[in-house]
Amino acid sequence: MRRERGRRARRRVCSFCVDKIEHVDYKDAARLKRYITERGKILPRRISGNCARHQRQLTVAIKRARIMALLPFTVE
């Protein structure tokens, strides 16, 4: 399934902006899990579709949640 030449994929919208979430909360582990790969890595902005502001907040929130043992650093 190759993309046609000259055709660009549609840009994903930031889910935090759509839901009008001002700050990303590190205690919301269910939401944060959507932005982590099965290997435990944080998804990049071009894949997740987040805006730059919320991607920065998301990164800090995931790192805090890992330290508080709400999210794993790696998979077993």
From Swiss-Prot:
InterPro entries: Ribosomal_bS18 (IPR001648), Ribosomal_bS18_sf (IPR036870)
Alphabetical GO biological process terms: translation
A GO cellular-component term linked to this record: cytosolic small ribosomal subunit
Gene3D superfamilies in UniProt: Ribosomal protein S18 (4.10.640.10)
Function in brief: Binds as a heterodimer with protein bS6 to the central domain of the 16S rRNA, where it helps stabilize the platform of the 30S subunit.
Family under the similarity heading: Belongs to the bacterial ribosomal protein bS18 family.
Subunit comment: Part of the 30S ribosomal subunit. Forms a tight heterodimer with protein bS6.
Listed name of the protein: Small ribosomal subunit protein bS18
Gene this chain is encoded by: rpsR
